[in-house]
Swiss-Prot record:
SUPFAM superfamilies referenced in this protein's UniProt entry, alphabetically: Translational machinery components
Organismal lineage: Bacteria, Bacillati, Cyanobacteriota, Cyanophyceae, Synechococcales
Stored InterPro entries: Ribosomal_uL18_bac-type (IPR004389), Ribosomal_uL18_bac/euk (IPR005484)
Molecular function via GO: 5S rRNA binding; structural constituent of ribosome
Basic and acidic residues bias (residue ranges): 1-10
GO cellular component, one term: cytosolic large ribosomal subunit
Name of the molecule in the record: Large ribosomal subunit protein uL18
Protein family: Belongs to the universal ribosomal protein uL18 family.
UniProt cross-references to Pfam families, sorted A to Z: Ribosomal_L18p (PF00861)
Zinc is among the record's keywords: no
PANTHER family for the chain: 39S RIBOSOMAL PROTEIN L18, MITOCHONDRIAL (PTHR12899), LARGE RIBOSOMAL SUBUNIT PROTEIN UL18M (PTHR12899:SF3)
CDD domains named among the record's database cross-references: Ribosomal_L18_L5e
Subunit organization: Part of the 50S ribosomal subunit; part of the 5S rRNA/L5/L18/L25 subcomplex. Contacts the 5S and 23S rRNAs.
Region named Disordered: 1-25
C-alpha cells in the first residue's frame, strides 16, 4: 500500500530538520505549503522565537492576490518575508523547504527572497 503524500512530506521534513538549525546569527527560513496558501517564517531555533513572518493571508497581500496557492502568491510572500527580515537586521538565513520538493511554489518563494536581499 502506498504512503499518502502528506506523510511523505512529513517524513522528508523530519529527515531534513536533523541537519538544519537556525541560530541568532543565521536563522531558519521555514516554508509551509498548504493547498490554499503558503506561509514563511524566519525562526531562531536557539531561542525558539519567530523573528519575521509572512503568508498569502497577510493584509498587505490579500487585496493584490487573486489566489493564495500559485507561484505569483509565493513570489509576493518571498519578497515580503525578506523585506521584514532585512528590516530586523537579518541578512543570512538557512532555507528549510519543509519537506516539500524544491520546485514550483517553494522555488518561487526562495528565488523571490534571494532577489529581495536574503542570502542562502
Amino acid at each position: 500500500m502506498s504512503t499518502p503524500r502528506k506523510e511523505q512530506t512529513q517524513k522528508r521534513h523530519r529527515r531534513l530538520r536533523r541537519h538544519l538549525e537556525g541560530t541568532p546569527e543565521r536563522p531558519r527560513l521555514a516554508v509551509y505549503r498548504s493547498n490554499e496558501h503558503i506561509y514563511a517564517q524566519v525562526i531562531d531555533d536557539a531561542a525558539q522565537h519567530t523573528l519575521a513572518a509572512a503568508s498569502s493571508l497577510d493584509k498587505d497581500l490579500r487585496t493584490s492576490l487573486n489566489n493564495g496557492a500559485n507561484c505569483d502568491a509565493s513570489t509576493a510572500v518571498g519578497q515580503l518575508v525578506a523585506k521584514r527580515a532585512i528590516a530586523k537586521g537579518i541578512q543570512q538565513v538557512v532555507f528549510d523547504r519543509g519537506g516539500n520538493l524544491y520546485h514550483g511554489r517553494v522555488k518561487a518563494l526562495a528565488e523571490a527572497a534571494r532577489e529581495a536581499g536574503l542570502q542562502f
